[in-house]
């Protein structure tokens, strides 16, 4: 992300006094430029100007000659005469130096003990070559500057006119620009213009109101001493021929080629430019390359420098041909794609020189012998550059800017700026210019003046709206109507509609000015009945000692392992078009499909006592006919929407549970038993009781349960005749899993499972009449015991139901307390013993009433179940 040196920023915008890096970051945040980090100064500690007083060459045993110097570092840093680590008659410090490009009387840069130089090089007084060096005389490289070719220390007398050299003790950090902190900012994709000092300075001006000076203003003689020179007919030949534009948009609509001749290849990059490049995260390479990088950082226009003597004109901008190759500046040979936009030379563009907007090639790069430089400044289409950069995995500073959008009017200005710098610092001369301009200004935006107020809730006066739009560079044609015509500035390709203009108005006025008002929820009744019921169910199951889990609803071919019949509707699972895992491409039709795998995983890891439950959706496609998917060209009709809804697989909320191993924990005072089928059924009864429902439980055969220990769960639906309730549809199963399946899965013996349709349970519960509390009878109860002999296949529930019907209002309670099988009953017969309690609400039952009720019970049970009273 871009680095913003405060010293550089001051050149283009008036910065408030006392502003440091933290304050700069805070000001930029106000206009939407977030702070990534604050980069501290490269050098810390005392770095001062020193004047060499004496220089004593001392030859060492290894033949090396070093200099022992006494250096005046200012009154506040000097050792007084006769004091210090090595006393001297001169107020100074003793310093050892191995360089020889200075003499007594020269002013140099001295780092004193306590300073930290780049590379975490800490300066301290140390004994070396027989003397104590109480500091260090610094070279450019030691301070992090590029090599100036002299390989020696910095002599300030060579940089300042006579009489203007700073006095000893002067702070050299500020003198050399080493104390400047840098702010790294985060730029969103729509704000590509902020990848330049020009853009950041403009945003800082918006934030603080500081006076802004556009570095792209060619009428400013300080930046452009020659103004903007016009192209002529004698410029380099250029052809732009994009025969395969992406999405119909040409890859290049503006191309400027500009020659600068006679550049001194040994001319150094000026210190101020090197410092700014380094502060911005770039290394100094050569004057020509540094100038192109500097102008890119300053204006936001990527440039490329070709060695003009290595080119064969014309330059051709075209699409690459299949199989073409290019060795880029990073020494990687790249195979080009026909969608790559390239710069080539020669007739017909026979030789590829660069990938447009991404990186140049090695064959035409600027070298240490280059004297004639051709500067390329172009406007490339963002999509074309972005695809090439991603295709070749080659993100560059250039591509980052082009793919976010570059000012389409900036190419000739940036080329002029680069030429001026090369002429000034490289001793070159202005050469001819060629420009191809096919750019088109975007159409004006019709903008409603009240749009910003409507969307933000802030009352923006007409004058403020127009003023803010003009402040960001828009041309506003205001004829006094409700709307205005707005033309976005060339550096803002992101301003394409009314919404973007509203965002700019809110941003410049300040997001803090938008009132923060949380919406107030309308008064209601809180949770719905279904929501409360689901919460109560989850709590009730957890209170029974079960642990809730959440598993993925995606399963594989588990149905054979669970031994489901071939025609079982649970096999009609929905197949996912793009599954997360190839071995789980189906949506579960039962919670047990995925919950069993969770239990198996726990058991395989040594957890033998498992009591898990899950509440989740199951999906079934049984009876669903998929509808054709309508196109996107127009809104689907109501009939198509209804067909899609009808063709969508149904989802129901189910509860599943797995119970195996010990029920609870064993201890000295506690005997622990294993979970069994009765626990599974009782869990279902607890849920039904919570919802105020009565259940009809009957034996059933359903995989994967044990055929003799599987309970089919139905809801008893009340009718107008309370003694004749209706038995509803099946809403679940509970019981022991089939021993063969348990063994196959590796679960403990007699593992149990539950599966309930919670949606059906909750729906039935919501329809139940409100239960009215009945007063507790204070009259005594009459107790009667019955032992009925029935067929082995007759469930006890049917006998109990007949007792309830016969007992009517007098029935207070009925319980099964014994089941007996014996030879005296005969084969296929069993005895069910019930304890019945009878009670009237308003009187004590007489013997005759009790006897009559007993007779009715015996008759009713015999009628509906064929039972005989056991003798």
What are these regions (language model features)?
Residues 199, 445-610, 837-839, 844, ...:
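Extended, well-folded interaction surfaces typified by the phenylalanyl-tRNA synthetase beta subunit core
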Residues 126, 316-366, 526-651, 717-718, ...:
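Class II aminoacyl-tRNA synthetase-like tRNA-binding/catalytic domains
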Residues 43-46, 295-297, 487, 522-528, ...:
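Beta-rich nucleic-acid/ligand-interaction surfaces
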Residues 3, 23, 470-477, 629, ...:
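A carboxyl-terminal module marker
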Residues 132-155, 159-160, 172-173, 177, ...:
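Mobile "lid/hinge" segments at catalytic clefts and subdomain interfaces of large enzymes
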Residues 3-8, 12, 24-26, 55, ...:
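Glycine/proline-enriched, intrinsically flexible loops and inter-domain linkers
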Residues 49-94, 274-275, 279, 292-366:
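Conserved mixed alpha/beta core segments that line enzyme active sites in large multi-domain catalysts
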Residues 1-234, 349, 374, 391-393, ...:
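Phosphate-backbone binding interfaces of nucleic-acid-interacting proteins
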């Amino acid at each position: 992300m871009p680095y913003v040196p405060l010293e550089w920023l001051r050149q283009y915008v008036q910065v408030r006094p006392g502003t440091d890096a933290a304050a700069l970051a805070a000001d930029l945040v106000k206009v939407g430029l977030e702070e990534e980090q604050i980069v501290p100064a490269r050098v810390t500690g005392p770095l001062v100007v020193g004047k060499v007083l004496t220089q004593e060459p001392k030859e060492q045993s290894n033949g090396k000659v070093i200099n022992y110097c006494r250096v005046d570092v200012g009154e506040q840093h000097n050792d007084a005469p006769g004091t210090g680590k090595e006393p001297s008659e001169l107020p100074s410090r003793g310093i050892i130096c191995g360089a020889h490009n200075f003499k007594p009387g020269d002013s140099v840069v001295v780092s004193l003990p306590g300073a930290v130089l780049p590379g975490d090089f800490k300066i301290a007084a140390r004994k070396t070559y027989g003397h104590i060096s109480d500091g260090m005389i610094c070279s450019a490289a030691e301070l992090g500057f590029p090599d100036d070719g002299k390989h020696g220390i910095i002599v300030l007398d060579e940089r300042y006119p006579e009489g203007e050299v700073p006095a000893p003790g002067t702070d050299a950090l500020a003198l050399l620009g080493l104390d400047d902190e840098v702010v790294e900012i985060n730029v969103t994709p729509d704000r590509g213009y902020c990848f330049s000092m020009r853009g950041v300075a403009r945003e800082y001006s918006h934030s603080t109101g500081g006076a802004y000076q556009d570095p792209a203003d060619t009428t400013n003689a300080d930046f452009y001493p020659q103004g903007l020179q016009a192209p002529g007919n004698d410029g380099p030949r250029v052809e732009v021929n994009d025969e395969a534009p992406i999405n119909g948009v040409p890859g290049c609509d503006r191309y400027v080629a500009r020659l600068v001749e006679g550049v001194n290849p040994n001319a150094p990059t000026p210190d101020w430019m090197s410092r700014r490049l380094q502060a911005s995260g770039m290394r100094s390479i050569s004057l020509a390359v540094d100038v192109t990088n500097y102008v890119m950082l300053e204006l936001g226009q990527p440039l490329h420098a070709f060695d003009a003597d290595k080119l064969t004109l014309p330059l051709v901008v075209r699409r690459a041909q299949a199989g073409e190759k290019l060795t880029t500046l990073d020494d990687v040979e790249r195979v080009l794609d026909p969608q790559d936009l390239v710069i080539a030379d020669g007739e017909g563009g026979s030789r590829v020189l660069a990938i447009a907007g991404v990186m140049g090639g090695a064959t035409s790069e600027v070298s240490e012998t280059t004297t004639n430089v051709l500067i390329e400044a172009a406007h490339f289409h963002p999509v074309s550059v972005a695809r090439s950069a991603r295709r070749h995995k080659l993100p560059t500073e250039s591509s980052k800017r082009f793919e976010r959008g570059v000012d389409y009017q900036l190419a000739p200005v940036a080329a002029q700026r680069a030429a001026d710098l090369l002429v000034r610092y490289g001793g070159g001369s202005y050469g001819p210019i060629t420009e191809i301009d096919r750019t088109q200004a975007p159409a004006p935006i019709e903008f409603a003046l009240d749009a910003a107020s409507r969307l933000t809730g802030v009352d923006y006066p007409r004058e403020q709206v127009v003023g803010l739009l003009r402040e960001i560079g828009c041309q506003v044609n205001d004829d006094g109507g409700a709307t205005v015509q707005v033309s976005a500035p060339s550096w803002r390709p992101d301003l394409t509609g009314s919404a973007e203009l509203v965002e700019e108005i809110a941003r410049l006025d300040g997001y803090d000015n938008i009132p923060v008002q949380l919406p107030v929820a309308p008064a209601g009744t809180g949770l719905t009945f279904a929501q409360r019921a689901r919460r109560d169910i989850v709590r009730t199951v957890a209170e029974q000692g079960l642990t809730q889990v959440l598993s993925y609803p995606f399963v594989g071919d588990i149905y054979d392992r669970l031994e489901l019949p071939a025609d079982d509707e649970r096999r009609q699972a929905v197949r996912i078009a793009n599954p997360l895992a190839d071995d789980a491409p189906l949506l579960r039709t039962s919670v047990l499909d995925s919950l069993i795998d969770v239990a198996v995983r726990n058991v395989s890891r040594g957890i033998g006592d498992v009591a898990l439950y899950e509440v989740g959706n199951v999906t079934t496609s049984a009876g669903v006919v998929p509808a054709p998917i309508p196109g996107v060209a127009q809104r689907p009709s109501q009939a198509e929407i209804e067909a899609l809804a009808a063709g969508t697989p149904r989802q129901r909320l189910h509860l599943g549970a797995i119970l195996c191993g010990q029920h609870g924990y064993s201890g000295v005072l506690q005997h622990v038993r294993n979970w069994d089928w009765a626990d599974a059924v009782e869990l279902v009864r607890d849920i039904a009781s919570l919802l105020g429902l009565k259940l009809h439980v009957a034996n059933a055969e359903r995989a994967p349960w044990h055929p003799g220990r599987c309970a089919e769960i139905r809801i008893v639906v009340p009718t107008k005749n309370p003694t004749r309730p209706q038995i509803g549809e099946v809403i679940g199963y509970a019981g022991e899993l089939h021993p063969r399946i348990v063994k196959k899965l590796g679960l403990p013996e007699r593992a149990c499972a539950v599966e309930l349709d919670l949606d059906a349970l909750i729906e039935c519960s919501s329809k139940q009449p409100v239960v009215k509390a009945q007063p507790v009878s204070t009259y005594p109860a009459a107790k009667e015991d019955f032992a009925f002999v029935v067929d082995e296949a007759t469930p006890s529930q049917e006998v109990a139901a007949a007792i309830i019907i016969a007992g009517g209002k007098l029935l207070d309670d009925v319980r099964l307390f014994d089941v007996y099988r014996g030879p005296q009953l005969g084969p296929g017969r069993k005895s069910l013993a019930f304890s019945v309690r009878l009670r009237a609400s308003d009187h004590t039952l007489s013997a005759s009433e009790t006897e009559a009720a007993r007779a009715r019970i015996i008759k009713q049970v015999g009628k509906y179940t064929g039972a005989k009273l056991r003798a």
